[in-house]
Amino acid sequence: MLMPRKVKHRKQHHPSRTGMAKGGTSVAFGDYGIQALEPAYVTNRQIESARIAMTRHIRRGGKIWINIYPDRPLTKKPAETRMGSGKGSPEWWVANVKPGRVMFEMSYPNEETAREALRRAMHKLPMKCRIVTREEQF
């Protein structure tokens, strides 16, 4: 799973999910990409699940780039715990994704197969997305 090796602070404030993405809004490495249309927290498990869905569909050939990284810890308090007594322990790692961000990129010779692989990966993500190419941008 993706997660930082070492962090300065174990617990962080929740990042803002409002506004549009400032960078990473165009396809830079591959020919096709998945672009977010809504803000969301994407967990390390969701990123890994989308990556596996893409690689299993394209088999050999092609290349995949992951442009987001889960560097934010989200905390959770145990079940049946009274209010107060501090913040909960870190439970999972998330990437803060804003609308317009290209999260995954892919280069593959056959466009139809590449679009199907990206469509399968989009089903694993917690927000609305769309497939973009190098020519068309947000």
Curated annotation (Swiss-Prot):
Superkingdom in the source lineage: Bacteria
One of this protein's Pfam families, by short name?
Ribosomal_L16
Q: Which PROSITE patterns match?
A: RIBOSOMAL_L16_1, RIBOSOMAL_L16_2
- Region called Disordered, residue ranges: 1-24
Q: Name one GO cellular component term.
A: cytosolic large ribosomal subunit
Q: Which PANTHER family match?
A: 50S/60S RIBOSOMAL PROTEIN L16, LARGE RIBOSOMAL SUBUNIT PROTEIN UL16M
The molecule here is called: Large ribosomal subunit protein uL16
Lineage of the species this protein comes from: Bacteria, Bacillati, Actinomycetota, Actinomycetes, Mycobacteriales
